[in-house]
Amino acid sequence: MPTSIRWSCGNLCIVDVTADEPPRFRFRLDGSNLVLSTGFDMTGKFLEEMPDAEYRRFVAAIYQRVLARKAPVFVVNQEDWKGYDLQVESVTMPLSSDGVRVDGILDAVFTAVQR
């Protein structure tokens, strides 16, 4: 792995998009930093298994937008998470094995505590 991106690997999610209608989202990888910050590991699970319903709806809306646009979606959001005021910045990018259908998503999520 290139050392220039190694620092960010714990902040990445790799998500498979099923061919079902409607599509389902299965986390192939949920980055270790994200697991530590959320308290749950989505690796190997479908989005509908995410325990936090409000966050699940938020993520689903972003993933649906990526599918519809076939383009990256950038989000900057303020969140109160476990008593901390966080600024969350993410870029969610479509992946395609055939160049036509979005069958994967790469999600990079970074947080900073706001004081």
Predicted regions and their residues:
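Sensory/regulatory domains in signal-transduction proteins
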Residues: 1-115
